[in-house]
């Protein structure tokens, strides 16, 4: 989070995932939704898209959005290039010293034949986040391309999250921050859960800072500060 003297707050949200999982398409669809419909979050300016002729992200995509209810709250939104050779750039975008990541949307290519590639991308994210996922950085999962055949379902991916210790059991105080898993389609004409997933991520990013001072707040933390 970056707080300026004029009271404006900038939160950074990163779409992360393997190459061709649909991150750029999601951002473009989110931009259209928030520009064309009355939503709690609106785009500011145009998207910055840096891509190859094939449409694959070359370095990153970036957009700026603003809360309509809390007008001094802004969201800097990035997508990262998912190809293996861009690991150093992904790390730089995620961990930029003066603008560190406040929340992550992990985008899964839901086709079952890409399961290992998705897990590899998740492991890289875990490593770069250095054990901060969920504890300090909220994460949402989008099982994208659900309009295709032979896709991963929610329970399959929940098992992966449990294996990677990115899922809390009910007795843990941070159970309320388990990643919500959305089954999505990024294509504008078939869009599903594009805005909902972003809105929830933005909500969690704010709650972590307001009630947890940059960490996952417990229900007691929230209760004490709302009394």
Show which residues each predicted segment covers.
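Switch II (G3) loop of P-loop NTPases
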Residues: 71-90
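Conserved C-terminal guanine-recognition region of P-loop GTPase G domains, centered on the G4
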Residues: 110-174
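Conserved catalytic network of the ASCE P-loop NTPase/AAA+ motor domain
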Residues: 55-58, 66-71, 93-100, 131-135
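Canonical P-loop GTPase G-domain recognition
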Residues: 149-213
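Conserved nucleotide-binding/hydrolysis micro-motifs of P-loop NTPases
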Residues: 20, 83-84, 111-113, 145-149, ...
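Inter-motif core of Ras-like GTPase G domains
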Residues: 87-113
